[in-house]
């Protein structure tokens, strides 16, 4: 069972399996296997009356029963629960498939989101036992180009447009900067498809960075409406977050990716991080670096401008709330531990605190934020030249990656 957010490449994994079988790069025991994709939506479509869905389900089961060496892929597999049981039809596809799953007649691969997996499979423990969940995380920006190569070749053939490795790398960076909520590899593929359509309409044979920029014309338009002073403040703000993470040594569960000053609707700029496979210790050093990173934008823009805008105010609010939550969860403070000794817990083991205790915790958090603020300010002042470098690149290009800055610092 492939479990992950929409767009992270669950179907791409199955396509890679197909290619490995065709090219015989898979384990020898899978030579000669056929991969069949089952669309639950197609099976349900038009099955209003009794017997129509049962006929489709029976045909599928008979096909599987009469063939060997099959891998059955069901995308959005959570739809099998209740599929076919609407109106006059009383058969559920999950029930129809259970005998096959019990006999291991074929290899079944399902794909769904985390929420749909938990919501649907929690209702049927027997079905849940038949699938081993494999959690699929969004690939890193560095891994996207090689991951989408086969799909990119299809797009190039369809649009009759070639894409250089330089433009491909640029697209993965810009796409994520402009739409951080969408997931790769689907995000980059969608942007490439749209950019290649633009290039094709203009009679071009090669995709350029300008074609990619046209996909995000609205973002560029919003950036161009900002005056130079406003751009500079945003650049220094994001550079602060960027450099604080660049200099960190204890935030091992996250990796710095990029910073951008392009307005995205939610904010005027963004600094992005990716999760790593490492586990954070949540000790004092880790907590201080996390809070310091949250405050760094506010501190950095203060180097060039007096007063605080909405972004700087938000930094302080988020840092204080984040630290307050961690103090309540992990302790971190002798004074808080004295408070929690006398607190009671509810049925979910959460502390029930009096208003007086809550006020004390808020004061503890504020005091610690002030301490971390001073430490982070000192660190950033000592590395102001790096902040200036990052801000300069942001003002010039709009987007800068961690690898680009690390390369410049080597020189």
Predicted segments — roles?
Residues 1-29:
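Walker A/P-loop
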Residues 32, 114-117, 163-168, 184-220, ...:
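Conserved C-terminal helix/linker of AAA+ ATPases
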Residues 36-64:
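Short glycine-rich substrate-engagement loop in P-loop NTPases that contacts/grips substrate
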Residues 61-62, 74-107, 115-126:
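Conserved catalytic/switch belt of AAA+ P-loop NTPases
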Residues 122-137:
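A short helix-turn-beta junction within AAA+ P-loop NTPase domains corresponding to the substrate/partner-engaging
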Residues 148-149, 160-179, 211, 216, ...:
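Short conserved motifs of the RecA-like P-loop NTPase core
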Residues 157-158, 173-186, 190-207, 220-225, ...:
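AAA+ ATPase "lid" subdomain C-terminal helix
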Residues 231-238, 242-411:
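Soluble catalytic regions of large protease machineries
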């Amino acid at each position: 069972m492939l479990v992950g957010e929409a767009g992270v490449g669950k179907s791409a994994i199955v396509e890679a399996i197909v290619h490995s079988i065709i090219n015989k790069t898979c384990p020898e025991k899978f030579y000669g296997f056929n991969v069949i994709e089952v669309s639950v939506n197609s099976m349900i479509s038009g099955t209003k009356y009794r017997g129509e869905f049962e006929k489709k389900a029976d045909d599928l089961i008979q096909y599987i029963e009469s063939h060997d060496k099959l891998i059955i892929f069901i995308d959005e597999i959570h739809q099998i629960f209740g599929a076919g049981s609407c109106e006059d039809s009383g058969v559920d596809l999950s029930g129809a498939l259970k005998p096959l799953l019990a006999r291991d007649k074929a290899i079944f691969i399902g794909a769904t989101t985390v929420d749909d997996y938990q919501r649907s499979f929690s209702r049927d423990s027997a079905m849940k036992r038949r699938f081993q969940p494999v959690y699929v995380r969004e690939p890193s920006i560095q891994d996207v180009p090689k991951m989408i190569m086969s799909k990119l070749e299809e797009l190039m053939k369809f649009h009759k447009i070639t894409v250089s490795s330089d433009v491909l790398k640029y697209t993965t960076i810009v796409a994520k900067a402009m739409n951080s909520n969408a997931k790769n590899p689907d995000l980059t593929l969608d942007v490439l498809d749209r950019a290649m359509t633009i290039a094709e309409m203009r009679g071009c044979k090669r995709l350029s960075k300008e074609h990619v920029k046209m996909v995000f014309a609205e973002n560029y338009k919003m950036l161009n409406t900002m005056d130079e002073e406003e751009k500079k403040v945003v650049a220094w703000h994001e550079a602060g977050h960027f450099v604080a993470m660049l200099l960190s040594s204890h935030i091992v569960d996250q990796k710095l990716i990029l910073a951008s000053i392009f307005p995205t609707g939610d904010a005027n700029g963004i600094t992005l991080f990716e999760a790593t496979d490492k586990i954070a210790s949540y000790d004092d050093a880790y907590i201080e670096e996390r809070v310091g990173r949250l405050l760094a934008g506010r501190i950095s823009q203060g180097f060039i401008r007096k007063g605080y805008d909405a972004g700087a105010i938000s930094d302080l609010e988020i840092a204080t709330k984040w630290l307050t939550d961690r103090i309540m969860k992990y302790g971190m403070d002798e004074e808080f531990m004295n408070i929690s000794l006398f607190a009671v817990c509810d049925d979910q083991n959460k502390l029930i605190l009096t208003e007086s205790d809550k006020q004390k915790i808020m004061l503890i958090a504020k005091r610690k934020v002030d301490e971390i603020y001073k430490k982070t300010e000192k660190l950033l002042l000592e590395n102001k030249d790096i902040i200036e470098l990052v801000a300069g690149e942001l003002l010039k290009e709009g987007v800068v990656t961690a690898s680009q800055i690390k390369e410049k610092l080597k020189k």
